[in-house]
């Protein structure tokens, strides 16, 4: 029996740190989505070209409670859409592939007893 292999992309976040050239902040990967979503799309493209068949959205830190601390909670939907669009742009450029969403840690994000609103 032949088994299929699904190859995910690598660490989008660490590539952003490497390519962005600035020290990461609590919003570093989210900040890139606001300033230069093409950088994210280019990273996805490089992973597709290297053989990945799935691009993971750059959305791990796009959490309303985190954004609220920086008065950016109104951007949550725009940022999610932008992270999906960046991955789709790379996939469409490559010609094939799938997109997987990346959701941050549930404990810190969704438990009001640990992380109050």
Model-predicted segments: where are they?
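Domain-level signal for soluble alpha/beta catalytic cores
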Residues: 1-117
């Amino acid at each position: 029996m032949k088994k299929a292999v699904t190859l995910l992309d690598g660490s989008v976040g660490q590539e952003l740190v490497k390519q962005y050239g600035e020290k990461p902040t609590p919003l570093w990967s989210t900040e890139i989505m606001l300033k230069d979503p093409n950088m994210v799309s280019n990273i996805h493209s490089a992973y597709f070209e290297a053989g990945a068949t799935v691009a993971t959205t750059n959305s791990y830190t796009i959490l309303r409670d985190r954004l609220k601390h920086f008065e950016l909670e109104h951007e949550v939907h725009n940022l999610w859409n932008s992270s999906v669009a960046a991955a789709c742009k790379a996939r469409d450029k490559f010609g094939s592939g799938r997109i997987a969403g990346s959701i941050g840690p549930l404990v810190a994000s969704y438990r009001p007893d640990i992380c109050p609103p």
